[in-house]
Amino acid sequence: MLSEASDFNSSGSRSEGSVFSRTEHSVIAAYLIVAGITSILSNVVVLGIFIKYKELRTPTNAVIINLAFTDIGVSSIGYPMSAASDLHGSWKFGHAGCQIYAGLNIFFGMVSIGLLTVVAMDRYLTISCPDVGRRMTTNTYLSMILGAWINGLFWALMPIIGWASYAPDPTGATCTINWRNNDTSFVSYTMMVIVVNFIVPLTVMFYCYYHVSRSLRLYAASDCTAHLHRDWADQADVTKMSVIMILMFLLAWSPYSIVCLWACFGNPKKIPPSMAIIAPLFAKSSTFYNPCIYVAAHKKFRKAMLAMFKCQPHLAVPEPSTLPMDMPQSSLAPVRI
């Protein structure tokens, strides 16, 4: 019980207002510091690659650039505030800091799921509906990306203005949705978030990648030129990277979703403290593994990273074919003013 938590001088004692000991808080703080530094550096490298090599600045990769910004946002704000509170033994930034911290984490998380949905739609239109995909303009992509940011902002602001609320969790070192107060406001907010930012995006992603996988299988069973084979291989690389990112994102946010659903339909007091800290740690983890996915699953991005480290001014990118499926994204239909 939080009211029974006491503050002793020994390093293994419980911190005031927390269910964790000083030692446990210190271990978590060390993890957050290392993860935060790793995340910031790796995502800065990602942005540097896109800045240096214009060959990679396609509308699809514009979504990846925005994902990198969301990762940097969590890493530069969420990690330091949480780590400082863990070192302190309890939340140290007051009520206003709690609202800012929790709001920004929800904001960047919701934006990320929106951007991953945009990636899935892009893969579907590029591979399975090329006639439609070719007609998409830069403004179309910008509108979808902006929609993801606006959606994230809406759900982040709602607890601040009264629909549900933000509060420190039982560990006392992080702020999140106040799931210990499972009133009607919390339940309605949580269920709407799950429907709008989990069930609907997953349905869209499943539909898109189901049809993309069918298109890729049909290609594999057909005869084609070496030139077209290279184009399809590039598209398959991007699709593989996208699917891995989505699966890892779901893995990262699943503990948080479980905690919220448990609080909605069960007794919040029975949620284990370990689950309370694992949920936000898992949710933040996507910030540093996304760059690893880019490198591991996308050959062109991997070559670009190596080229940047070797200080090569240009990236050798083969000319794509002019067949409908793989029209280069740089030749999208002109933006209509």
Swiss-Prot record:
CC annotations in GO: membrane
Superkingdom to which the source organism belongs: Eukaryota
Residues on Extracellular side: 1-26, 88-101, 165-188, 265-272
Protein topology in the membrane: Multi-pass membrane protein
Disulfide pattern: 98-175
Alphabetical list of Gene3D superfamilies matching this protein: Rhodopsin 7-helix transmembrane proteins
Coiled coil: none
Record localization: Membrane
One example GO MF annotation: photoreceptor activity
Pfam families reported for this sequence: 7tm_1
Summary of the tissues where the protein is detected: Found only in the eye, where it is localized to the retinal pigment epithelium (RPE). In the RPE, it is localized to the microvilli that surround the photoreceptor outer segments.
Transmembrane segment boundaries: 27-49, 62-87, 102-121, 141-164, 189-212, 241-264, 273-297
Residues bearing attached sugar chains per UniProt: 9, 182
Residues modified to N6-(retinylidene)lysine: 284
Entry's Gene Ontology BP terms: phototransduction; visual perception
InterPro entries tied to this protein: GPCR_opsins, GPCR_Rhodpsn, GPCR_Rhodpsn_7TM, Peropsin, Retinal_BS
Protein function: May play a role in rpe physiology either by detecting light directly or by monitoring the concentration of retinoids or other photoreceptor-derived compounds.
Protein family per UniProt: Belongs to the G-protein coupled receptor 1 family. Opsin subfamily.
Protein name: Visual pigment-like receptor peropsin
Gene: Rrh
